Each structure stands twice: as C-alpha cells, then as structure tokens.
A protein has these predicted regions:
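Active-site-adjacent beta-strand/loop module that shapes the phosphate/pyrophosphate-binding cleft
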Residues: 60, 70-92, 102, 108
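Conserved Nudix-box catalytic region and its N-terminal flanking loop in Nudix hydrolases
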Residues: 16-55
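NUDIX/MutT-family hydrolases
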Residues: 85, 94-125
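Conserved hydrophobic "DFG−1" position in protein kinase catalytic cores
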Residues: 11-12, 19, 88, 103
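Short secondary-structure junctions
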Residues: 56-63
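Conserved N-terminal beta-strand and adjoining loop/helix that marks the start
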Residues: 1-18, 38
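Generic C-terminal helix-cap and adjacent flexible tail
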Residues: 1-2, 126-132
Length: 132
C-alpha cells in the first residue's frame, strides 16, 4: 500500500482560520481544505509546508509548531498528515491553485464540505478551541 506524506497549514488571524476550496481541475474539486500538499523526495516536513504555501498562496510563512499528525486511508493509499500552526506570514494571499480562499470562524466550519482527511484535525481544533 502506498504511503504519501502530506503537510497542511493552520493559519489563524483575527478569530478566523484560512481555508481554501479546491479548483475545478483538481482531484476532489469543490471541497474545502487547509492549504498544503505532498512531501517531495529529500524534503523536510517544514520545508514542504513552506514551499506549498508559497506555491499555492504566494505567501512566505513563519511556522509556530507541529499541531497534529495522523494517518488517513483512502482507497489503496495511506496519507500521513502533518498540520503545522503558522505564526505569521508576509505577502498578499493569491489564488494560484484554489478557486476560493476564505477566513472562517471555527463555529462556521459545518457550513463547508471539507476533504475527509481534514475531519480529525477539525475535531482537534474544536476540542482545543480555548487556545485559539
């Protein structure tokens, strides 16, 4: 069974989280997710999420810490997911891959259809709501 390492970013500002909708030409088009992507060969997890944020949103981010890590199985693939808290970023958010970007309060997440693999981190965010 194939194992793919994927990083995601938890970006929080002014009581809202940044979420992105997958574009029409992407797998799982129309579903919402936290920005991020797949680890490349010989790349660290930290460098992966920083690269993905630059590629997907055209921002330079500063990481705070690893927030959550778990595995998710979809068909014949296991995804090892690593979500990092972002301390801050510079640059203007751009839509290079996603067709929509939104700042959303945690209490409103139920109004969005997320990738199934994001469900565990969303539950953790809700459980940890006092730290946000």
């Amino acid at each position: 069974m194939e194992v793919i390492k994927v990083t995601g970013a938890i970006i929080y500002e002014r009581n809202k989280f940044l979420i992105c909708r997958r574009g029409p030409n992407e797998k799982a088009a129309g579903l919402w997710e936290f920005p991020g992507g797949k680890l490349e060969i010989n790349e660290s997890l930290e460098n992966c999420i920083l690269r993905e944020l630059k590629e997907e949103l055209d921002i330079d981010a500063e990481l705070h810490s690893l927030y959550d890590n778990y595995s998710f199985k979809a068909k014949d693939t296991i995804y090892d997911l690593y979500f990092f808290r972002v301390k801050g970023f510079s640059g203007n958010l751009s839509k290079t891959v996603h067709d929509e970007i939104k700042w959303v309060e945690l209490k409103d997440f139920h109004n969005f259809s997320f990738l199934p693999g994001d469900a565990p981190v969303i539950k953790k965010l809700e459980k940890d709501s006092k730290i946000w």
